[in-house]
């Protein structure tokens, strides 16, 4: 499911969800909400903060040290620079929903 399909799914799910505070959600509002969540997670991760959404999962940043590697084409040794790797760990509720 791509982003556009997910936004359509959000609006449909809102209309059928008995727990939703509002029974109407336009695609424009759903897109704004989704973009806000994505932008907020990215901003928090860039600021070196972990984002824990209980039951859903956590977004974290892991620092990877510089290391020596090989160019797969030539086999020549090269140094792979240190970098920060964003990671996602699924929460219990999400794991249970998948099984």
Swiss-Prot record:
Entries under Gene3D superfamilies matching the protein: IHF-like DNA-binding proteins
UniProtKB keywords: DNA condensation, DNA-binding
MF terms (GO), sorted A to Z: DNA binding; structural constituent of chromatin
Disulfide partners: none
Superkingdom of source: Bacteria
SMART domains, per the entry: BHL (SM00411)
GO biological processes: chromosome condensation
Pfam families found in the cross-reference section: Bac_DNA_binding
Subunit structure: Homodimer.
Function: Histone-like DNA-binding protein which is capable of wrapping DNA to stabilize it, and thus to prevent its denaturation under extreme environmental conditions.
Protein family according to the UniProt entry: Belongs to the bacterial histone-like protein family.
The protein's name: DNA-binding protein HU
Higher taxonomy: Bacteria, Pseudomonadati, Pseudomonadota, Alphaproteobacteria, Rickettsiales
